[in-house]
Amino acid sequence: MIPKIFIQSELTSEQKETVRLIWNNEYPERIKKATPADFDTYLEQLSHTTHFLVYDESHIIRGWAMTFQRDETPWFAMILDASLHRKGIGSQLLHTLKSSTSRLLGWVIDHTTERKANGELYTSPVDFYVKNGFAVNAEIRLETPIISAVQIEWREI
């Protein structure tokens, strides 16, 4: 599959729902967005967003990434349908995100105790991000009742 990546500042309602379903299928169940309103609330808290949608050959959204500003620093979130894993598409998507900035920060779950909605163990993507040039800031963590994650950072050399 040769994916097509489309970049846009806002998502349509249909796109949001597709992304929300991918989110709920691929991320740990504890951080799911149960309703479209939950996903809208998440997005509305972010500023200066740019969305990157990965479409397959049937023009179906199979992945999504987003860059946004937090405290004047560029952050990102990214999720791919499991059918796209280990095909280079995630790396291609990251390359697209990196092409418009000199720095990116993100939160990554770094343990293997979480379960996805289908009951499978969630595989931490830390190694994927390290392979793609990110550094793990082990001393900076996000610890809440629903998520435990480590900060990752990429800087243009």
Predicted region positions:
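A short, internal acetyl-CoA/4′-phosphopantetheine-binding micro-motif in the GNAT/acyltransferase core
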Residues: 77-86, 110-113
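Conserved beta-strand in the GNAT
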Residues: 53, 59-68, 74-79
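Short amphipathic alpha-helix that is part of the acyltransferase structural core
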Residues: 1-37
